[in-house]
Amino acid sequence: MVRITLSRFAYLLILKPAMAEFCQQYPGIQLEISVYDGTVNIIKERFDLGIRFGDILEGGVVARPLMKPFREGLYASSAYLSRHGTPEVPADLCHHQLIGYRFITNNRILPLLLNDRGEQLTVEMPGQLISNDIDVMADGIRNGLGIGRLFEPVWQLQPDRERFIPVMERYWKK
């Protein structure tokens, strides 16, 4: 048995595309998959493999990159932009709704960080919708509830991604 812990995002981008082929190719290996967006002590919980995004590691853990770096984008629906206009610069965002993300690990809301010619900007925006789930955030964007953040690979997984209009691409964080 191979015990794997990974975030939902890591499951969607890394494991899901390869799982069926792996199981067919190695029928004698049983996989136990734990999908959890919180912090997991891989050693204490006796996992064989953990997949997370970021660069914070527990002691005694070895990390290897599995993906190339990607950008976090801002997206809105055409209906939202028709009602509220398209922001052009960070100062415009104070007149828009942010679909926020709350960390499951510490209950903090992820600040909106943008990049302006190498300078990091923290932008305060009002928001009606906050979630700890990328599908809820994508649904909020899709339904015109505000401007939301999605990592580019998550945007690429959306079956109707043409409905997600990129906003202020020159300020996206890499």
Residue map of PLM features:
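Central regulatory/effector-binding core of bacterial HTH transcription factors
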Residues: 1-62
